[in-house]
Amino acid sequence: MSDAETNAWDAIHRVEKRTLLELFDADSERVSKLSHRLAWGVESPGGQEAGGILFDWSKTHLTDELLDGFEALADAMDFAGAREKLLSGAKINVTEGRAAEHTAQRGTGAEASVEEAVALMGRMKALVDAIHGGAMGEVKHLIHVGIGGSALGPKLALDALTRDLALVDVHVVSNIDGVALEQAFAACDPATTLIAIASKTFTTIETMTNATSALHWLKTNGVDDPHGRVVALTANPEAAVEFGVDETRVLPFMESVGGRYSLWSSIGFPVALGAGWDEFEGMLAGAQAMDEHFASADGRANLPLLAAFADLYYTRVRGCQARACFAYDERLGLLPDYLQQLEMESNGKRVKADGTPVDGPTAPITWGGVGTDAQHAVFQLLHQGTHLVPVDFIASIAPGDDLDPAHHRILLTNCFAQGAALMAGGNMAADEKDPARVFPGDRPSATMLCDDLDAVTLGALIAFHEHRTFANAVLMGINPFDQFGVELGKKMAKDIESGGAEFDASTQALVGAAGLA
């Protein structure tokens, strides 16, 4: 750790710990200092000017003194230099020797990379338009097989953007468990179904096994040329062609786009096909708007960086091992899962980018749920448990339904009430000596309040969390773009399948009990 980094952390640790209520009492401008609204200068797919998001960190323990310390830490870790490397296409993924160019897919990056991304997007749009125009016959269903970032991002976007009837009914299948694929088959007519195979390498065992079974399903149900119903989304187009996919239906994406950051590439094909090209393009526009903010704002004015300051304060100063996200919007039901992969796969590391051990705790356990469902399941622990868990609340001012406005009013009042209750605490006992009804309070939360959950806002929201994850990584000295932690278990699974390796007695017994020996 450099002297500048040590000095910054020393300053952060010296800041007096005060309760949230004390912080509000001490500063009448606290809300205005720690609440920031970002609005987009772009139109939503519906033609109206898109709105924005209000970010509120006033219910966290951040103070001017803490922010001064974290800004010094950002300088010590050369955050500005790391940001420039990310956005200019430098090889910032040092362990794998390549760039991380997901922002280039939406127009922010090295000129040559942006031009390549635009060309690839044009190719995808042409295919989407052709399918919608009947070039592949009647298409009512798409079975999209992928795993990890190749599946979770598209499914999140489709859930958020296809409340109205989808242009094409999309079923995203990621699990190797055959039940998942059979459920998709049951909902689709083989004669009007396409298969999308999403795999960066086109070798991922779960995806390729599911793809082979999907082709077999088409063949055994009267489709003479099942490969003629396949679209491939990959950074290895040669492998897709070798698999039997016609080159005109192979949609490549750049090798420098990581899986969990790949929604913006051809991996977004099912979103464009199911929700419409305008919706997909709206997501790109919203993400680019967030890119522009991230690229230009400095210090605490940079909202993804400000979020990272709060994250690091709770993990490294307050010792929090988890952070929760609760979406008070049914359309964002998969957002906690998406963030779980984004943050834990990116920053769940024990060594820094230079190979030395990390200096403290890294990514917390990211978890969460949906709205009032979660209140009746896990909020007991948040309010009265022994774990201090910072919470992010996400909601939309505009409802996503056409029902009685009472539905949405109750939803929002619950969202805001939970943040207030976590902070203030209270005593609900008729007898004040009953400790079981005491709420200690001083539990931190942040709120992200969207004007509306349209495609532009969704893109901005996802990009915000990407940049937040990157900012955390820079401040910890981590490379967030590799994921070697997923490899060992995959290798051992192959060894069990081949029967060519000895394992511990417990694993051997399980293999035998399952009849796999």
Curated annotation (Swiss-Prot):
It is an enzyme of class 5 (isomerase). The active site is at E345, H376, K490. The gene is pgi. It comes from Erythrobacter litoralis (strain HTCC2594). Pathway: Carbohydrate biosynthesis; gluconeogenesis; Carbohydrate degradation; glycolysis; D-glyceraldehyde 3-phosphate and glycerone phosphate from D-glucose: step 2/4. GO terms for biological process: gluconeogenesis; glucose 6-phosphate metabolic process; glycolytic process. This is Glucose-6-phosphate isomerase. Belongs to the GPI family. It catalyses: alpha-D-glucose 6-phosphate = beta-D-fructose 6-phosphate. PANTHER family: GLUCOSE-6-PHOSPHATE ISOMERASE (PTHR11469:SF1).
